[in-house]
């Protein structure tokens, strides 16, 4: 019973921390800073440091219409992956990590100046995960 109670308490603490992080008012700078690390760990091998990808194999994120202007599709691709392509789902990342890496790509390589520059917040990711009725 003690082990179970400890597990329950850990889960409650995780849920509280997640709620705290998703409700926080994140600045663009905070998301970009965190997103740069997430990108380096999860994205750079395919999309490259400069966001140019590998022509004919992995698409560029720099100048991408989706990254520039289609926030809902941008979230969907990271959450669902792209069927028939090498892009897998990254739904195992936390809401904060997903929001940060998407914001990082939307703010990097000239994308902020050429697109809508809109940030993605952890709350956007939580909203995406809600069941669609």
Language-model features and meaning:
Residues 1-30, 91, 95-96, 100-133:
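Flexible coil segments in periplasmic/lumen-exposed cytochrome c-class electron-transfer proteins
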Residues 28-54, 68-80:
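Sequence/structural segment immediately N-terminal to covalent heme-attachment motifs in c-type
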Residues 55-59:
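Short acidic, glycine/proline-rich loop/turn micro-motifs
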Residues 60-115:
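Extracytoplasmic electron-transfer domains, predominantly the class I c-type cytochrome c fold
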């Amino acid at each position: 019973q003690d082990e179970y109670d400890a597990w329950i308490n850990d889960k409650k603490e995780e849920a509280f921390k997640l709620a705290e992080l998703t409700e926080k008012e994140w600045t663009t700078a905070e998301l970009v800073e965190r997103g740069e690390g997430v990108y380096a760990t999860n994205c750079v091998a395919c999309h490259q440091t400069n966001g140019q990808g590998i022509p004919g194999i992995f698409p560029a994120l720099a100048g991408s219409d989706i990254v520039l202007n289609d926030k809902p599709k941008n979230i969907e691709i990271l959450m669902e992956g792209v069927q028939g392509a090498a892009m897998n789902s990254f739904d195992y990342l936390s809401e904060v990590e997903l929001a940060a890496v998407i914001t990082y790509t939307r703010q990097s390589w000239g994308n902020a100046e050429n697109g809508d520059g809109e940030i993605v917040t952890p709350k956007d990711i939580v909203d995406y995960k809600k069941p669609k009725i």
